């Protein structure tokens, strides 16, 4: 599934992605790419995540123990490339490989308790590990032990002897000529030691090269385990769900984690949203500041989470498989490219309609940058064009009559409640007052869209000097509309 960086930013997808926290270097690198899975890969990913999630819930494995083993693991991308290209004879690279193999051997018996979870061949991993592990070596570190080669033992002993002789001569006040001879001898011995160490490292790398396939498999296995474990921990932290593929996009008691965190951070609360969008184009109407944009963003996140095998922030959810998700929102900045806001919108529509494949379109008040009459007419045409291509979509708008002949479903934000003034309530004119009166829940739309703009303005403290005139004008317009109908 393709989605533009701008659409990702609009949804808050990058902030959500930051909440998914694999602990290993390789896992974190992979997660930053927001991997969208093929259908076959998705099925296997879902199966493994469910097995691991159930094991965590049942206490068969401990997330903290697994996390401690995964946390220090390096990425082997560079080490494996060097090894396969004929290199790899460097202590640091071999050290990284041994770290991973050791962790795999430690993790295998723990994950074996998760019936059905795929494992790598323990014997093959042990054989690769044995190439890097000599008797007496630290278990998780690679060191070039003297016991690996008689020549290495001899070269190290000679280097030590030469260094001691030089230090003793300096301490005894030896002559310059004597010190020069000893210095030259020590340097020769040191160079010889480096040559022998290089030869031994090359032999280790050569022996390890025959195990390259095992190392690659083990490295991928431990990275996937990290990714899956972090997905399960995220689901548990959210109390979320694993979204299921379906012909509909349905969310039960969902919330936008990024928006919720901001609200809670300033002492507020958030309201969960539920909706069920059938195949085709659906509409969403409601008051200004009523949560329409957040509902669309949540829908986009569920599509992304579903396609990526991530948990969704909802009690339950289904998602549609599509080739792309497109967002129509925020084109007002188009003036930077020599276009008016309306011109930028039109260019975005044209680009959208040139796309191929199956798609889902999220449109946040499109056609709002021109006159209401022209905007409603253009939006009607855009919705029809999206539907004619067999795409799905959700269009948020204030044009309540638009799309009625095409839309598969229509939703509305409940809007402002009538609540009597209470002692201790937030003062009128504050955002807190508006939030306390706004009902952000979604309901199936019934009739024309509610118009709460004047009430919202009043709650935000706009004075009667403006509002009294606005009410008279609106009443006059509504009266004229009723007479003409």
Tell me what each language-model feature is:
Residues 78, 102-105, 136-260:
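Conserved P-loop NTPase architecture
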Residues 1-160, 218-221:
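Conserved amphipathic alpha-helical "coupling/scaffold" segments
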Residues 84, 107-114, 232-239, 309-311, ...:
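Short helix-capping/linker segments at secondary-structure and domain boundaries
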Residues 53, 77-80, 98-101, 105, ...:
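Short, well-ordered alpha-helical packing segments
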Residues 37-44, 68, 89, 96, ...:
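Catalytic cores of large soluble enzymes that bind and process phosphate-bearing ligands
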Residues 58-59, 204-209, 282-286, 365:
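Glycine- and acidic
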Residues 238, 245-485:
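ATPase nucleotide-binding head domains, primarily ABC-like/P-loop NTPase cores
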Residues 51, 75, 79, 203-207, ...:
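A general alpha-helix detector
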